[in-house]
């Protein structure tokens, strides 16, 4: 007898004694008469017995409000349980009452021996058209194999069923994936996963891989049979299909255990694909195109998490120092992953293309601001709702705090840019680059930060060098090493300017270069070993060229001796070797030194023929001279070696500008510089040319050697230098040479000679003298009108010359010539003629000067017309500007009550200007007398022999005086001429001398 007790709380409600074979235990009611309380409890037990028994066999259900309740078993269910218990008891009693049996054979794995198998006769079907046979579906049995070889090996339906059950148990326990391969279909993959319904079978569908088909799973009959056996291991739990959602795709449910709207299936199970219009869709059903597109598949999350899990495992760190364990809730980890995604890439849906496009098209600043704001909100959510993930909140705060780093001090950036923006040399360029990086703040890339450190390193080195070099005013630590990199001249790298041999094609530049060679170069006459060209005269001494080494000896010993050259007295680094500005060294304007601080001395420089050599401190570059010029050897005239600098600039001039460039150099630059100008004048001229032709600022300089002993800069041409021991100037380009033009530059070298006298050869006095000659020389005046028309303005320096110019008809001649060229020259001539008429009326010199000064400003406005490549134009502009400014200043001086001495000096100045003109005019007046006397003497030669001696001597004295006045000499000498007929007149004069 077995006793069952039913308890409610702490009270015993019912005690039942059951026999082992009884399906339901009988209720025992005591027969004795109980007391009053016992009777009440007995009645309650009798009343609740059946209800509690049904409740014991009930199931737990959760309603829509989340309340868990016990659903009691139905009466039908209770009767079934009683019948099942009775059957089990009867089966056990029958087994125990059965007689003893002998075991005669043992069969392993439940198979049937071949001897016991019966041969099955296969009856072929008759192919007739008849009614469709009714399909009979069996529940869970596998059809016997028809293959004879399988039957011979003992494969029976029961053995295959056992195999499937064993594999199902293994997959359910380990989670491995199974593949079922049918006769006609592809492999069907399935595995057992743990869900809220228990361990459920999940089939791999096509849409799990992103493939959308009308039939999501294709299986044949044999595959379905095997899958049915495997599905027996699925949890047999009542399920409501209406609660299925994402992640339920591929799950298998038995039809008799589920409730809710679903699609009908041929089998007794359904494979979840998705939901269409509230109806659960089976994966094996063939859908229409529209139904397939409207079906809401339940595998999106599964695909996402499968990719997330795979990528997470592939990229996890391999050098972990501990064994990982599952300490956090998986659901909470999913929430954290979503928050991190929203902080990095804010969006409405992670699969939304519009959100992705919006983030992509947003500018950097706006996106960072939006992203930072979202990160702050998410960080607060993590701290409040997920305290276990404080590390994530810390990461977000640190990461986005760097994103928000901005440089608020924009004013400092502007001030730095104002200070160093105009400098193009180190360290100002490094300061400017560092300033550009610092203003970026958090937007600076790692490469830019590394570049900032490099710029800061260069600034640090500069400050250290400056401190060391300027300390105590000593040059002991001065270093100015030569650049290790050769200068890249882009004009020599363009393929269009080079021939097939890599030589420069001069083009029109070579033709216009003749203006240099014809005016400032001498043609070398070969012969005598070029001895007459070896010594080069300089203002304070000589320098020897290596032109004699063009004749090369084949004796190696003698050749080595020639390569030694002739050394001058070597000078150490002194104050003259450096140039400073604002207490800083201008390194391009200093002499080159070695690593130990000693100067770099020049060595023997080999000569070449017909080359232009450029490249100062680096490796020299040899350019062939233009083809028309290279047929002969040219050498710069004495005092004009600086022409090689302008010739080097011509390399970087466009061919269309070559004519204008060479004319400017010939008509403006060289006349101002003359012979042996100072370096500061040459640098200023280069600056003027680079303003018109910016590309020339990058032109390379010829080699320049510094002679501190003679205070001279030697511009080395292609004939090299035999003398050695000179210092080397570091400046390598025209831009670097222009730095010598600064008045604030503290340098002795800028006053060294490179060519000319200190005063210009073309000045106002020389011009007025030429105008005085041209007044009485029509050919010279015509040449001035054609070539230098603005020279006529210089006649305003002298009222007398201005009147003579107007009376000679030169202004009318100019008007007829200029009327075809432009209005400015014609207006200039009319104004000069008007001023001359007004001046001729005045008697006093100072009144005439006042009339000229009053017209200076108006004439300046008339002729000022941009830049004209003409030396007389600049000279006229300069003179008129001086007159206008002098007029304005004198007026202010007179208003304040002061007196100028200009009135007293005007007559003296006019007298000095007219003195050579007066002598010349006297000689011109006497010219006709000389001509007439010569003719008279020739005609009356015979008649003078009859004259008295006293009259003949008087005639000789008159002729001698006329000749002296005409030639401008006090001791005039009349050369004998067989054509003059004056031998008898010239003879006494020659005897006198």
Swiss-Prot record:
A motif (Involved in virions binding and aphid transmission) lies at residues 607-609. Residues 633-755 form the Peptidase C6 domain. GO terms for biological process: proteolysis; symbiont-mediated suppression of host innate immune response; transport of virus in host, cell to cell; viral translational frameshifting. Signal peptide: none annotated. One of its GO terms (cellular component) is host cell plasmodesma. Gene3D superfamilies: Helper component proteinase. InterPro entries: HC-pro, HC_PRO_CPD_dom, HC_PRO_CPD_sf, Pept_S30_P1_potyvir, Potyvirid-P3. A motif (Involved in interaction with stylet and aphid transmission) lies at residues 349-352. The record marks 298-299, 755-756 as: Cleavage. Belongs to the potyviridae P3N-PIPO polyprotein family. This is P3N-PIPO polyprotein. It comes from Potato virus A (PVA). The lineage of its organism: Viruses, Riboviria, Orthornavirae, Pisuviricota, Stelpaviricetes.
């Amino acid at each position: 007898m077995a006793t069952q007790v039913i308890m409610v709380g702490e009270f015993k409600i019912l005690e039942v004694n059951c026999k082992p074979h009884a399906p339901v235990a009988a209720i025992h009611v005591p027969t004795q008469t109980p007391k009053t309380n016992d009777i009440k409890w007995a009645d309650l037990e009798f009343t609740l017995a059946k209800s509690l028994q049904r409740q014991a066999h009930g199931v737990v259900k959760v309603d829509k409000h989340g309340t868990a309740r016990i659903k009691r078993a139905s009466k039908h269910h209770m009767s079934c349980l009683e019948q099942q218990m009775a059957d089990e008891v009867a089966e056990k009693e029958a087994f125990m009452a059965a007689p003893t049996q002998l075991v005669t054979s043992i069969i392993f794995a439940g198979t049937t021996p071949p001897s016991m198998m019966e041969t099955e006769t296969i009856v072929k079907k008759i192919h007739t058209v008849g009614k469709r046979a009714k399909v009979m579906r069996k529940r869970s049995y596998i059809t016997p194999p028809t293959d004879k070889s399988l039957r011979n090996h003992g494969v029976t339906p029961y053995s295959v069923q056992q195999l499937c059950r064993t594999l199902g148990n293994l997959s359910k326990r380990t989670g491995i994936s199974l593949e079922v391969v049918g006769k006609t279909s592809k492999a069907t993959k399935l595995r057992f996963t743990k869900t809220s319904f228990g361990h459920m079978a999940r089939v791999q569908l096509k849409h799990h891989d992103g493939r959308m088909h009308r039939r999501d799973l294709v299986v044949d009959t044999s595959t379905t049979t095997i899958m049915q056996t495997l599905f027996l291991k699925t949890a047999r739990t009542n399920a409501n299909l209406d609660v299925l959602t994402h992640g339920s795709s591929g799950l298998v449910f038995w039809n008799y255990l589920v409730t809710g709207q679903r699609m009908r299936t041929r089998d007794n199970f359904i494979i979840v694909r998705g939901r269409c219009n509230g109806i659960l869709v089976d994966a094996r059903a063939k859908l229409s195109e529209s139904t397939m597109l409207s079906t809401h598949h339940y595998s999106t999350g599964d695909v996402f998490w499968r990719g997330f899990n795979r990528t997470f495992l592939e990229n996890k760190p391999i050098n972990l120092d501990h064994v990982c364990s599952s300490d956090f809730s998986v659901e909470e980890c999913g929430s954290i992953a979503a928050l991190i995604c929203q902080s990095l890439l804010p969006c409405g849906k992670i699969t939304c293309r519009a959100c992705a496009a919006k983030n992509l098209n947003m500018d950097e600043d706006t996106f960072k601001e939006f992203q930072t704001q979202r990160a702050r909100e998410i960080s607060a959510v993590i701290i409040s709702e997920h305290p276990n993930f404080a590390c994530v909140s810390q990461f977000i705060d640190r990461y986005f705090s760097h994103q928000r780093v901005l440089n608020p001090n924009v004013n400092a950036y502007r001030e730095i840019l104002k200070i160093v923006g105009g400098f193009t040399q180190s360290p100002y360029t490094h300061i400017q680059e560092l300033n550009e990086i610092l203003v970026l703040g958090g937007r600076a890339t790692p490469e830019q930060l590394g570049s900032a450190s490099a710029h800061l390193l260069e600034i640090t080195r500069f400050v250290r060098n400056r401190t060391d070099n300027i300390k105590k005013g000593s040059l002991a630590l001065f270093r100015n090493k030569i650049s290790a990199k050769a200068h890249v001249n882009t004009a020599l790298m363009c393929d269009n300017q080079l021939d097939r041999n890599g030589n420069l094609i001069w083009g029109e530049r070579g033709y216009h270069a003749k203006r240099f060679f014809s005016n400032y170069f001498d043609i070398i006459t070969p012969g005598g070993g070029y001895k007459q060209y070896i010594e080069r005269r300089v203002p304070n001494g000589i320098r020897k060229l290596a032109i004699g080494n063009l004749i090369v000896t084949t004796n190696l010993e003698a050749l080595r001796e020639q390569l030694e050259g002739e050394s001058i007295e070597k000078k150490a680094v002194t104050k003259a070797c450096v140039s400073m500005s604002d207490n800083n060294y201008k390194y391009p304007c200093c002499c080159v030194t070695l690593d130990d601080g000693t100067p770099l001395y020049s060595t023997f420089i080999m000569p070449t023929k017909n080359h232009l050599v450029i490249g100062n401190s680096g490796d020299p570059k040899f350019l062939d001279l233009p083809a028309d010029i290279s047929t002969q050897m040219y050498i710069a005239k004495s005092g004009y070696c600086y022409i090689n600098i302008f010739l080097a600039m011509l390399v970087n001039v466009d061919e269309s500008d070559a004519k204008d460039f060479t004319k400017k150099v010939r008509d403006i630059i060289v006349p101002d510089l003359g012979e042996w100008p100072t370096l500061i004048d040459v640098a200023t001229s280069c600056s003027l040319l680079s303003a018109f032709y910016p590309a020339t600022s990058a032109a390379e300089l010829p080699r320049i050697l510094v002679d501190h002993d003679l205070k001279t800069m030697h511009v080395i041409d292609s004939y090299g230098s035999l003398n050695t021991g000179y210092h080397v100037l570091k400046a390598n380009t025209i831009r670097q040479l222009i730095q010598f033009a600064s008045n604030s530059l503290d340098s002795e070298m800028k006053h060294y000679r490179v060519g000319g006298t200190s005063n210009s050869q073309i000045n106002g006095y020389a011009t007025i003298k030429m105008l005085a000659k041209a007044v009485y020389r029509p050919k010279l005046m015509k040449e001035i009108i054609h070539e230098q028309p603005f020279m006529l303005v210089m006649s305003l320096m002298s009222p007398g010359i201005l009147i003579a110019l107007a009376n000679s008809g030169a202004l009318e001649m100019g008007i007829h010539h200029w009327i075809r060229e432009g209005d400015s020259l014609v207006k200039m001539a009319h104004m000069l003629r008007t001023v001359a008429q007004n001046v001729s009326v005045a008697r006093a010199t100072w009144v005439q000067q006042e009339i000229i000064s009053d017209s200076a400003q108006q004439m300046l406005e008339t002729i000022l017309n941009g830049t004209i490549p003409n030396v007389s134009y600049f000279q006229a502009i300069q003179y008129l500007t001086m007159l206008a400014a002098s007029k304005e200043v004198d007026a202010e001086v007179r208003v304040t009550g002061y007196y100028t001495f200009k009135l007293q000096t005007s007559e003296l100045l006019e007298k000095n200007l007219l003195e050579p003109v007066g002598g010349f005019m006297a000689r011109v007046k006497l010219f006709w007398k000389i001509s007439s006397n010569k003719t008279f003497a020739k005609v009356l030669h015979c008649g003078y022999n009859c004259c008295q001696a006293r009259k003949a001597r008087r005639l000789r004295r008159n002729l001698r005086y006329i000749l002296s006045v005409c030639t401008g000499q006090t001791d005039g000498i009349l050369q004998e001429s067989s054509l003059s007929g004056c031998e008898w007149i010239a003879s006494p004069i020659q005897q006198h001398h």
